[in-house]
Design a protein with these regions (language model features):
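Short C-terminal domain-edge/linker segments immediately following a structured domain
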Residues: 76, 99-102, 197-200
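A general structural motif
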Residues: 48-51, 96-106, 146-152
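Glycine-/charge-enriched secondary-structure boundary and capping motifs
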Residues: 4-18, 23, 27-42, 91, ...
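Mobile "lid/hinge" segments at catalytic clefts and subdomain interfaces of large enzymes
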Residues: 1-4, 12, 16-18, 38-97, ...
Length: 212
């Protein structure tokens, strides 16, 4: 029960910081089996409005040569992650919650979308960057080339579920404007891939690459 109470307190803190209304929710303590408590994960409903649905940002990338960025900082945080679940691993650090950074990320993504800079985007909360780009490639049926940024362990980069991060795909013509906007707001933006339908797009990166 303590874990559940802490989870709802965290939800309240996040709603206040981000200005998000919760329209409904559900949890049943009658689902407890024997001595095993239910997971402290309430289900909540949140309503969002897009003023013009034609301006929505899809998950699937489309343009050959479009640049793939990861926004935010990645840390060695695997407790409670999909990797930990699949490996049956207990231990390590859970992703640290940074609500001001989450708000900043949301503001940047919305602003960039309104300005027509972003052609696709995806969260990395369910499996990390590696899972996210695979889902984007499968949705688009178009591959891409990737490289691991310097000064970070490849495993951490691909599978960490650090918060306040998102993948943004932009046309090459928007790279300068997008980078300057992120820098001006204090958001790290790291280019780590390029969309490649198989025509041999030059990634512009000399290091070892992975093709998805």
């Amino acid at each position: 029960m303590w874990q559940f109470a802490q989870a709802t307190t965290g939800l309240a803190d996040a709603c206040l910081e981000l200005g998000i209304p919760v329209t409904g929710g559900n949890v049943s303590f009658y689902n407890q089996t024997g001595e095993n408590a239910i997971s402290p994960t309430p289900v909540v409903g949140v309503l969002g409005v897009i003023n013009n649905v034609e301006h929505r940002t899809p998950m699937a990338w489309a343009g050959d040569g479009d640049l793939i960025y990861i926004l935010g900082d990645t840390a060695d945080e695997f407790a409670g992650s999909e990797w930990a679940h699949l490996q049956g691993h207990l231990g390590g650090l859970p992703p640290k919650v940074d609500l001001p950074a989450e708000r900043l990320l949301s503001e940047i993504m919305v602003a960039a979308s309104h300005e027509g800079m972003i052609t696709a985007a995806h969260d990395v909360s369910d499996g990390g960057v590696g899972v996210a780009v695979t889902e984007m490639a499968l949705r688009a049926n178009i591959g891409a080339r990737f490289w691991i940024p310097e000064n970070i362990d490849p495993f951490v980069f691909l599978f960490s579920e650090s918060t306040a991060r998102a993948i943004a795909v932009i046309p090459g013509t928007e790279e300068l404007r997008f980078s300057e906007m992120c820098a001006a707001r204090g958001m790290r933006a790291t280019r780590f891939g390029v969309v490649d339908s198989g025509l041999g797009v030059n990634s512009g990166h000399p290091g070892e690459q992975v093709i998805v």
